[in-house]
Amino acid sequence: MVLRGKTTIVAVLVLAVAGLALGLVAGHHRSKPSRAHARAETFMAGDRSFSVSYPTGWQASAVGATGAVLQRSDHRGVVLVRERPALKGSLSSLVKNLPRQLAKRFPDFHPVGASVARLATGPAVVYTFVRTKAAKVQTIVIAPTARRSVTLEAVAPAGAHDAAREAGQIVRSLKSR
């Protein structure tokens, strides 16, 4: 049986998502460091509230005192980092409302899944979805801390496995002050 149309696109994107999600929540354990680990620089927020490390081939720019945009030189990956006020509700209630909010924001939204990852800041929600018409895989990570939360959004084109892996390394490098 041959899949056609939207079903084919969704199937391909869901497979691509698996790579992005694994890159975000699981470290790569190899005897040799990956190319992305070869050299890294660190971006520190203007108010010094957080920092992230990023590999060669990425550039970081400040967005005000509490945000950053990190983008690959070839534009095949981007990570947005924003400091937010402390969460008022639980992580589970946040995840419950997220699909509805994202469906309003992105007409081609297709949810893939949610999980919890352990970052240096503590437990974080990882919510991954595809945008079928845009052929993008997107992951939102919400990392609460005692005084604030940090939201990271990683976006990569379907099939950009190296960009997804590097975006995952950036997310996992988050440190909050």
Each predicted region: which residue ranges?
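Conserved polar/disulfide-associated segments of primarily extracytoplasmic proteins
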Residues: V2-G5, H29, R35, A60-Q169
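Hydrophobic membrane-insertion alpha-helices, especially the h-region
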Residues: T8-V25
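C-terminal region of N-terminal signal peptides and the immediate post-cleavage residues
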Residues: L20-E41
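N-terminal "mature-domain start" segment
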Residues: R35-V63
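Extracellular, beta-strand-rich glycan-interacting domains
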Residues: I170-R177
